[in-house]
Amino acid sequence: MFDAVIDVIVLGGGPAGLTAATYLRRFHRSCLVIDAGDSRARWIPESNNCPGFPNGVSGVELLRRMRQQATEFGTQFESQLVDRVALSDGVFTLSSGSRSWRAHRVILATGISDRLPDAPWVEEAVACHALRLCSICDAYEASDSRIGVYGPLADIAAHGLFLRSYSEQVFLVPSDDAEGGSALLEAKAAGVRVLEYGGTLGFDGSRCSYTLGDGRVELFDSIYPFLGADTSAGIVAGLGAALSEKGELLVDRHQMTTVPGLYAIGDIVSGLNQISVAVGQAALAATHLHNALPFAPRISRGAKDT
């Protein structure tokens, strides 16, 4: 596909990476997207806060449209899981097994992977909105319903308080027996209820449940799990890229990491994990990157280049 060093490799084919690719190709920069096919967006059954979709859009459909748009402008794709990123003499080399690609710049857009309850029904519950993964994205749809918030008590108290502005019936479902601290006191004062630790999560095909030790069952229209997330930012830690305490890549106002020429966008950086934010970060990174690359005067070819 590319025998020489190309301008940019975008690692990750979610909303952030696909937006960056579209921008880069419209800047007439050679661009390859390497994607493992596991974008977090694919879990979204329907998004109603994504601009331009008044009737909502599924994550799968949004990804399809964004990939189609990037392809229309000549973006090339590889379906691979990159396991190594190296830098030598100003050129990045990305490797997957015995295969490798080289580029002058890299945009890391690999996102994060949510830690979900260890249960066989998780995908089905997400698909029917019984298990929701983003309170900022879809708490509006859960308004005035019974909402559970599942995870370590110290972590979920603040989330429960946030959700209290959407419903009168918010329950903290602890995955541990730790103390909740001041955040828990604030949540309780706002009317958030706390269930006993040690129960069992369940799903009946349409609603999630929590069975307590004494046999009582609490049913929820939706449960939000907050169990943390895993990131692949470590793949560039060997290059000297600085990470936050949470393992997120630290970037400047242009989305460049502490490694010159290496950019990061989307959920892999610190900030609000929203598609709209990721798209904006992609525009910033792609534009700065384009202007930082050597000037390439246009030679008319009479047709679109590829």
Regions found by a protein language model. Give the residues of each.
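FAD-binding core/adjacent interface of flavoenzyme oxidoreductases
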Residues: M1-I6, F77-S145, S222, A237, ...
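Beta1-alpha1 glycine-rich phosphate/pyrophosphate-binding loop at the start
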Residues: I6-E61, S145, P152-A178
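N-terminal glycine-rich dinucleotide-binding loop that anchors FAD/FMN and/or NAD(P) in oxidoreductases
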Residues: S30, A36-D38, P45-E72, C134, ...
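FAD-site-proximal beta/loop scaffold in flavoenzymes
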Residues: E124-E141, L227-L272, S276, L284, ...
